[in-house]
């Protein structure tokens, strides 16, 4: 379990500082947390994976909700970070949040989405409404749709050497 004791300089626990860094895109605060855990990398990963705000959002959820790509990029650089945490109530992943952010800032959202996919975010995870991130788009943003659909296709198809489909893509056409 990560340390939650209060730090002397801010009065906030390490988990609270992680959440604040993610919410405010505060790379300096995140780096100071990294420095204090320099000799304890496993504890740092545990802290990053377990830190939640009062509503259940992880640091990655908050980065994607607010478009805070600098902190997200720093977090994603660490091996062992869970890139698919699901919100305890909605089951939304950071990828769901990044897609929702695309309605505000499509270019920044695309960057967030591409980075999440690059490190292994699961484009097929569904929220409590049974929706994958791509299904949140509606008719908007073809670049983001193409990125998500390409990532899902890559998951569904074995390497070309084997050349066969692992499973069919989830689509509304299946019901017809």
What annotation goes with each model-predicted range?
Residues 29, 70-71, 108-112, 143-144:
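Conserved ankyrin/ankyrin-like repeat signature
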């Amino acid at each position: 379990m990560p340390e939650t004791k209060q730090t002397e300089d801010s009065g906030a626990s390490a988990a609270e500082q992680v959440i604040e860094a993610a919410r405010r895109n505060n790379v300096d605060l995140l780096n100071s947390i990294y420095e204090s855990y320099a000799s304890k990398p496993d504890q740092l990963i545990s802290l990053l994976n377990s830190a939640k705000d009062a509503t259940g959002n992880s640091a990655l959820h908050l980065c994607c909700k607010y478009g805070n790509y600098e902190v997200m990029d720093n977090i994603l650089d660490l091996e062992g970070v869970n890139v698919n945490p699901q919100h305890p109530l909605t089951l939304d992943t950071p990828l769901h949040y990044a897609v929702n952010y695309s309605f505000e800032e499509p270019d920044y959202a695309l960057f967030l989405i591409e980075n999440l996919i690059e490190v292994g975010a699961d484009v097929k995870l569904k929220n409590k409404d049974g929706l994958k991130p791509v299904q949140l788009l509606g008719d908007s943003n073809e670049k983001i749709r193409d990125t998500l659909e390409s990532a899902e296709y890559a998951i569904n198809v074995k390497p070309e050497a084997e050349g066969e489909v692992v499973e069919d893509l989830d689509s509304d056409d299946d019901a017809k």
